């Protein structure tokens, strides 16, 4: 059945057809059922965390940890390159726990999952610690070569050797690079020189004057 709808502003009539409400209800039911089936399949496809992969190490300079597994969720804290973490669950994002017991969700691209054996091996191996506020690692022992990644203070990389003014290092995900000795040092040496008195802490704080503050930053 066709009716006419009057449009007074333009002074013309538009034909329209009455809705078949029964047909519309069937379509709504069908698409709702299809949506539940698809989401149910997706839920079944989400892998659980195997017992031998319930550990990991951060593989980017700064890893943002969020309250939920999505980019729009608020940041709770940050984890740094080389930090060992426990993997609590995986739903497309990893829920992780840091050594200081903070928990949060991180994107799967920023964590290198490991077996307990490889995780323990990473923790035992000698590390190079970045001491400068910011810098880069390179493909060759030359600052004019291709960069591998950025690094920030506190980042830890596996020490593979030395070449000239550079340390050869490797990442948790297997990448290898060179970092200048001017911005990093062996972890044992760094720890032996570390001062935690009030004067040293204040001095370090002053070196960050003018750096933007980030809520939940590390």
Language-model-derived ranges and their functions:
Residues 62-63, 185-186, 208-211:
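Acidic/histidine-rich, surface-exposed loop or edge segments in extracytoplasmic proteins
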Residues 92-95, 164-168:
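Short aromatic-glycine-enriched beta-strand elements
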Residues 70-109, 113:
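Post-signal peptide N-terminal segment of secreted/secretory-pathway proteins
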Residues 60, 132, 174, 179, ...:
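Residue-level signal for pocket-adjacent positions within structured domains
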Residues 48-51, 57-87, 130-159, 213:
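Beta-loop motif signature
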Residues 1-49:
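Bacterial Sec-dependent N-terminal signal peptides
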Residues 44-53, 98-129, 142, 146-147, ...:
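Boundary regions of SH3-family modules and the immediately adjacent low-complexity/disordered segments
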Residues 198-218:
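Catalytic cores of peptidoglycan-degrading enzymes
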């Amino acid at each position: 059945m066709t009716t006419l709808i009057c449009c007074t502003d333009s002074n013309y009539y538009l034909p329209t057809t009455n809705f078949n409400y029964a047909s519309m209800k069937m379509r709504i039911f069908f698409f709702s059922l299809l949506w539940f089936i698809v989401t149910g399949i997706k839920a079944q496809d989400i892998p659980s965390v195997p017992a031998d992969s319930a550990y990991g190490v951060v593989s980017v300079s700064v890893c943002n940890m969020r309250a939920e597994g999505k980019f729009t969720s608020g940041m709770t804290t940050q984890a740094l390159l080389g930090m060992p973490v426990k993997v609590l669950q995986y739903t497309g994002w990893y829920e992780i726990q840091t050594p200081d017991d903070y928990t949060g969700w991180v994107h799967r691209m920023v964590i290198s999952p490991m077996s307990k054996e490889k995780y323990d091996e990473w923790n035992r191996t000698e590390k190079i610690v970045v001491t400068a506020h910011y810098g880069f690692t390179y493909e060759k022992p030359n600052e004019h070569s291709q960069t591998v990644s950025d690094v920030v203070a506190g980042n830890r990389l596996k020490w593979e050797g030395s070449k000239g003014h550079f340390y050869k290092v490797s990442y948790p995900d297997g990448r290898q690079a060179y970092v200048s000795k001017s911005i990093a040092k062996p972890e044992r040496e760094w720890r032996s020189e570390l001062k935690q008195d009030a004067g040293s802490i204040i001095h370090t704080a002053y070196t960050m004057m003018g750096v933007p503050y980030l809520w939940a930053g590390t």
